[in-house]
């Protein structure tokens, strides 16, 4: 009689362990900053850097920064005069379709995958000081 009880307890403990491991949350899809860093390297770094202006402005600190405000970068009039502060929601929309957010801006680029957009924004947010 003792052996079946030990087996039941062991089986229950193993089952709970497996459920716990399988059920661990990794966060919402696309919100991982590490994944965003990879997407940024593949999709964004040709024109942008985190710390210096390239074809596009530097992006470190973009979350919470006024649009079109990086010193020394030649923004389009539309973006320079947009008058908003970048937040996560607006950056996701921007990456989805820049022209839908600010018409006639100089960046014509889209990230069609929603998880990739969210991941890039999570990465950019992680760079905010």
Give the ranges of each region predicted by the language model.
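Bacterial N-terminal signal peptides that target proteins for export
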Residues: 2-13
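The canonical Cys-X-X-Cys-His
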Residues: 40-50, 120
